[in-house]
Structures are given as C-alpha cells and as structure tokens.
C-alpha cells in the first residue's frame, strides 16, 4: 500500500469522503508460510515494499495492500514479517489491527514463530480472526493433521474457535471460500465508533516532494478531516499540527472514518522529527502518562523477578520498569510517556528475547503514590477487585471530586449527561455540574462550609457574603477537608503529600522523594545546622 498523500498542488481541491465499511486485517504466522503470497492472491498487489524483500523472498517490514469483496466490503491488509528477528515490526503491524489472519503452511506445520504470533494475538486481545492453511497443493495428505494441530495449539486463545480455510495460491483452490469467510469474520467484528476520539499510531513517516511530510497508520476509531488540527505526540515532538490532506486506498479524500488505512499529509512538520510509535490525537482528549497499573492477561507471572522489559503498545516499543504487586498485578513505569487509557492492551517482551513475556490490560492511568511499607500489597488487592473497564467509584473516592471530562479521558465509561444520573452513576457518586463527587465526602464538605459561613458572618455580620477563598483557607486551616485527591481532582489539604511535590524522576517511578543520605564530608554542616536552627535538618536540592 502506497498510502501516498493528495497532490500538493491541489491540497484544497474538493474530494469525496471515504466510503465506510472498510476493515483492517493483519497477517500472522511463521516465516515463509505464504503470508505475503496469500495477500497478493487476494488483492492482486505486492505487499513487500522493499527491493531487498522481493530479492530475498522475505518480508522484513510492514507491507500494505487492499481489495474489495463481492459484497462491497473493503479490506485493507497489513502484512507482517514472520522471522523471529523482526518480532518488533510484527507487533507494530498487529498491535493496532482489530482482525488477525493467522497463516500456517500445510507442508511445514506448526513452528516456533507460529507460537510467538499466537501469543502476540492473545496478548493484544484480538478476538476476531481466521486461520488459513496455505500450500494445500504441496501437501494434500497433511491437511487434516495440520488442522488438528492448529486446533490443539489455539486451545484457550481468542482464535480457539476461529474458522479454518484451506487454500492454494498457486491453483486458486479455496480462495472463493476464503472470500466468503472474510465477509463473515468482518461482519461479526465490532463496528468502529466514528464519533470517538482519534488515536492514530504512526507506523511510517516520510517526505514526498511537493507534498511534504506524510505519516501512515491504522484508524480504528474517530474520524480525520482535512484542514483540522490534531495533536502530534511522539518521541521527540509534542505539539498541534494541521492536516493538509488525507488519502485512503490510494485515493484522496476529505474525510476518513474507521476502520481504515490512512495517509496523513501534515503541514510544517519535518519528517526527521517523526518516528514509528508516535501518535496523532484528538487535542485535549488523551492523558499522556508514564506510570500505570496493569493486570496480566496471559504469559509469565508478573512476580517472576523480571524487572526491565520492553512494552509494545500500538506501534510503539518502549522500555519499562515493572514493580510487581503480585503474580497478576503490577505497576509499569515507561521510559517515555504515551497516550493511554483504561482497557488498552500491552505486550511485554524481555530484552534480547524474541518471545512474548506477558500480555497486560491497563487498569489505571493515574495511579496513587506508593510511599509506605505495604502499599504495594494493598494496591494489588485493590486492583484484584477492579473490573476490566475501570472503577468510577474508586477513582472518585480517591480524589474526593473530579471533573467528569478527566475520567472520560482516562477511558472510564462515564455516563453521558443525557442519561439520568440516578440510573447511570454508581452508588456513592453524585454529579455536581461538570464534576463527579464522592457522596460521603460531599456531606462533610457541606457541613464544613456551613460552619465556616456561620463563623464568618458572626465575625463580620455586615459583610455581603463569604468569599470562596475563605472557605478554601478555612478547610486548609483545619476544618473537615475533602478526601485526598490527585492534581486532577479536588485540591487536597495543605499538608497532603501531593504529586506536584515530586521530581520528574520520582513521578516516573511512582514513588515519593526520599531524603538523600548525607556524605561523611557534610555531617559537620548538618550538626551545625541542627544546633543553629534547633530542629532536624532536611536535605534537599540546592536552590
């Protein structure tokens, strides 16, 4: 797939909107099992983009092709490499894809990367897909045995009951049946939400003469329009940019809706600043986080002792540090922040290993600090009770009060204002304008406010009213205060150990700052300081 942008000479020319009903399918399977040949047979296009790939007959990076089914449904294929050396490239192609096409050759059977790719599909939570047995003409007597082998290896995975189709790209055997099954699989897939916020993980970035910088990716939700402004967040860039033009299926379009492979022509962005793993986002709609709490969905126990790992999220690959709470739950600290939400899937891989270590489900993208002994074990027990979609009551209770839009950005299923609050909100949560408030805390605040108002009016009976500032200062001075929150919730009391008091490194590791150990050279100064001040000296940063 070329994914090339509109001609730069006519970036504002009228173009029709992209047709809906497109589905993106990523291939998977061991090297040299016929993935690229299968895609070529279905689409009439060569997915391998590089001369070296065609010369060696080996897919190295992601390839792209598309076709239309007789039903009118459109398919866009992402062809991934099968060789173990290119596992990171495979995960970048499979990560954003909603449907998987698992390929196994009849003449070779199940092999090492077959297991790796199966594990990646399971870790990513891809629940829609099919299995294609290729090269039926080369080993017709092994078809039944290969199918039984596939069923055995897929047991307990999302593709356990996936349809299996046998084909031969050489003779054309089974291709008609495959097209029918592709229609059925895409029909069963969940319809994408075109009204959702955009998060387009970038898999390629390049420059086209006369057009400028282009990025490509898989649009799984939301919509993109020419002329609109989006946020570009990445390894070396984070700013708003303008969409100069769009293209899908090699045709210019004014708008792209999901699902789709899309090329986005960006205005005034140097291509050298962009990398695979960057993301185009709806502005002010995504939390950019580097600390998150997760649950294991498959793979090795999280308390197995491995601390330094590589996390694959979308098309991004980021080093992470893992702090296990128990075998099933942990805290991840990312080497760089990413746009993430509750419900996202992560693949963990040990450095130097070509195997999947574990699959993760994101439970919290704004977790509480863990500064006291035993906090990790307590947090593990809390997360064990948390549903996969997040816990609105727990998030509101921890903060006391939080803006509704904040929890929406986190990915929690906050009910729309059009739904009666009494029916949609959990017990213990009340809606106050654009805020969600913990009901027990609200009662305390109301009583505290009444007390403060009465005191102020008694002290100044001629005053026109009580300033809001007085209420805030009164709370901080010792009156009943809101429950401890985060910087995104209600302001905490003055003595609260607040996240903003931590350094950037402390925030990244999810821990509070600790006093530095005094060197032998500085002990005398410390004793003199204590004598002079009459209180314990606290070592901090210079300044």
PLM region descriptions:
Residues 83-84, 107-111, 126, 135-140, ...:
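Conserved nucleotide-binding/hydrolysis micro-motifs of P-loop NTPases
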Residues 25-29, 33-42, 85-91, 109-112, ...:
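P-loop/Walker A NTP-binding module and the surrounding RecA-like catalytic core of P-loop NTPases
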Residues 138-144, 149-152, 249, 269-543:
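C-terminal effector modules of nucleic-acid-centric enzymes and ribosome-associated factors
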Residues 80-85, 95-145:
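Conserved Switch II/interswitch segment of TRAFAC-class P-loop GTPases
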Residues 136, 152-300:
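Conserved catalytic-core segments of large NTP-driven translation/proteostasis enzymes
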């Amino acid at each position: 797939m070329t994914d090339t942008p509109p001609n730069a000479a006519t970036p504002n020319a009228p173009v029709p909107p992209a047709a809906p009903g497109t589905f993106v399918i990523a291939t998977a399977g061991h090297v040299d099992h016929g993935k690229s040949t299968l895609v070529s047979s279905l689409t009439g296009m060569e997915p391998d983009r590089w001369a070296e790939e065609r010369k060696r007959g080996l897919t190295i990076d992601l390839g792209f092709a598309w076709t239309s089914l007789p039903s009118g449904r459109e398919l866009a294929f992402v062809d991934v490499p099968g060789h173990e050396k290119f596992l990171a490239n495979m995960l970048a192609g499979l990560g954003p894809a909603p449907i998987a096409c698992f390929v196994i050759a009849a003449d070779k059977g199940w092999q090492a990367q077959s297991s790796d790719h199966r594990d990646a599909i399971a870790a990513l939570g891809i629940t829609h897909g099919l299995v294609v047995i290729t090269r039926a003409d080369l080993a017709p007597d092994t078809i039944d045995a290969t199918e039984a082998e596939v069923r055995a290896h897929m047991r307990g995975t999302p593709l356990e009951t996936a349809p299996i189709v046998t084909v031969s790209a050489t003779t054309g055997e089974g291709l008609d049946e495959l097209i029918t099954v592709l229609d059925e699989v895409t029909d069963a897939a969940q319809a994408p939400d075109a009204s959702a916020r955009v998060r387009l993980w970038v898999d390629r970035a390049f420059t086209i003469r006369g057009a400028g910088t282009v990025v490509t990716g898989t649009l799984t939700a939301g919509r993109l329009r020419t002329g609109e402004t989006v946020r570009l967040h990445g390894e070396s860039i984070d700013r708003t940019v303008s969409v100069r033009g769009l293209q899908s299926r090699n045709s210019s379009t004014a708008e792209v809706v999901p699902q789709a492979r899309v090329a986005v022509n960006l205005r005034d962005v140097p291509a050298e600043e962009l990398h695979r793993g960057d993301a185009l986002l709806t502005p002010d709609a995504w939390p950019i986080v580097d600390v998150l709490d997760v649950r294991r969905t498959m793979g090795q126990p999280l308390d197995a002792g491995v601390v330094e790992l590589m996390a694959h999220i979308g098309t991004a690959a980021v080093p992470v540090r893992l702090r296990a709470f128990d075998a099933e739950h942990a805290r991840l600290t990312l080497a760089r922040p990413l746009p993430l939400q509750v419900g996202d899937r992560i693949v963990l891989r040990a450095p130097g290993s070509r195997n999947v270590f574990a699959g993760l489900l994101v439970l919290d993208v704004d977790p509480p600090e863990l500064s006291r002994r035993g906090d990790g074990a307590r947090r593990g027990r809390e997360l064990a009770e948390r549903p996969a979609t997040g816990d609105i009551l727990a998030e509101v209770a921890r903060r006391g009060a939080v803006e509704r839009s904040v929890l929406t950005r986190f990915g929690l299923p906050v009910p729309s204002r059009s739904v009666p609050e009494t029916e949609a909100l959990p017990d213990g949560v009340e809606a106050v304008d654009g805020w969600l408030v913990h009901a027990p805390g609200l009662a305390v605040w109301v009583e505290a406010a009444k007390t403060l108002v009465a005191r102020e009016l008694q002290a100044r009976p001629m005053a026109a009213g009580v300033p809001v500032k007085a209420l805030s200062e009164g709370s901080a001075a010792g009156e009943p205060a809101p429950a401890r929150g985060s910087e995104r919730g209600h302001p905490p009391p003055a003595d609260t150990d607040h996240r903003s008091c931590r350094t950037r490194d402390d925030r990244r590791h999810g821990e509070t700052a600790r006093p530095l150990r005094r060197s032998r050279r500085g002990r005398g100064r410390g004793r003199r300081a204590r004598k002079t001040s009459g209180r314990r000296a606290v070592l901090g940063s210079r300044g």
